[in-house]
Amino acid sequence: MAYDATKGTKPVFEIYKKDGWYKDFDVVVHDECAADITDPTYVENILKAHREGVPAVNLHCAMHSYRWGKFQQPVKAGDDNAHWYEMLGLQSTGHGPQQPIAIAFTDKESPIVKGLADWTTVNEELYNNVQILGAKTLAKGLQKVPEKKDKKGKVTPASEANAIVAWTNEFGPKKTRIFSTTIGHNNATVEDARYLDLVARGLLWSVGKLEADGKASAGFGK
């Protein structure tokens, strides 16, 4: 595991600077929050692993990492600021307030979510969807924000938002398996057995060790 103690959004992992850094990895879990890392050469060396067939599991803030230029707008395929989003399979640029998210699994036949029950999180961040870049939806989230009145009496009306919150993608010439979920801002969510089951299944799927019934292949589960 590579850990960077940076508390901001500029974590730099020395391992990512090395040629062939990924040669001994079966899968890479991206759980970094690197929104202000904007060096294309550094990012391309990360992406090289996935172009060459190493699967990825992307969690929460990984979706808002390695972005620059006019990333708030839909990126154009092939541009240097599009490559990270192309690996993810979906472009997201921001989120709303922390409120519970009602998660509904949409692809009932995917082994990643087969048999999983819909559930509602504790307060979480619902990441927006700017555009889909190959993602295959597994789950969507609905977040309702209640009416709010500030100290001056100004009222912000109640609202609701929908977004894809879990998906798969096939990336690059080798159609590398990619699993991503935007859920997971708070520890209470990450500790939830339902969240852990989803991520574990996504990881097993990415490395080809998840059976059609949603159970781990022999030797890869409890």
Which residues does each PLM region occupy?
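Aromatic-Pro/Gly-enriched surface loop or interdomain linker
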Residues: 1-25, 210-211, 216-222
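Extracellular ligand-binding/catalytic regions of CAZymes and related secreted enzymes
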Residues: 145-222
